[in-house]
């Protein structure tokens, strides 16, 4: 589960 930190490049859902 990714939050705002993973918005775009670091998308690790």
Swiss-Prot record:
Subcellular location: Secreted
Keywords: Secreted, Toxin
Keyword Secreted tagged: yes
Tissue localization of expression: Expressed by the venom gland.
Molecular function via GO: toxin activity
Gene Ontology CC annotations of this record: extracellular region
Protein name: Toxin OcyKTx3
Protein species of origin: Opisthacanthus cayaporum (South American scorpion)
């Amino acid at each position: 589960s990714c939050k705002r930190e993973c918005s775009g490049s670091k998308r690790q859902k």
